[in-house]
Amino acid sequence: MPHTAEQWNERYRGAPCDLPREPAEILAECLPLLPAGPALDLACGAGRNTLFLAGRPQSVTAADYSAAALEILESRARAAGHPVERSSVLAPPHGPRGAIRIAEVDLERARLPENSFELILCFQYLQRSLFRGMEKALRPGGFLLFETYTRAQVDPDRVGVTHRKDFPSGPHNPNYLLAAGELRTAFPTLETLFYRELRAGKGIATLLARRPDL
């Protein structure tokens, strides 16, 4: 899996036509529960989840380190008629619902604005230093939907899988993989609404959590 911005750029420039357009399955399933206020899509990639929310319509700030991925997102967003603005600030976009703010940022060093978003998405990305900031960036009553890979990806025997090929996606470095049960307790100030950890056939953990009202 790529690590540097240039490696990610090469990946996105190499196969833009093959990139998925459908949202993450869990996002589509949870949509009726999720607030429609300003959203933040961390490590958005080419923006399949950003565009899904913007079509709701919902204002979305889409953040990623790859300029190439964000170029694809901007092209798709403009083609769909969404207002687009570029910024290095991780704040809600200006403009009507359906507007998208595209932010090219290094998430390893990013600071999230407090009490700014009603919904935060984080898919297939793990940066533990962001966890406290993600909690604080939610407005009271705001939701976090988080899904990424676990260490079952590199320890398949523990879950009854005999070949690494059964886990074709995700990083190999354990530092970028969740330990068993880690995501369940990663956001102690939030109320867990749903948690799932798949170990047979997939090494993925999913969390839907909510910041309590004041």
What are these regions (language model features)?
Residues G142-Y149:
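Conserved beta-strand signature within the Rossmann-like core of class I S-adenosyl-L-methionine
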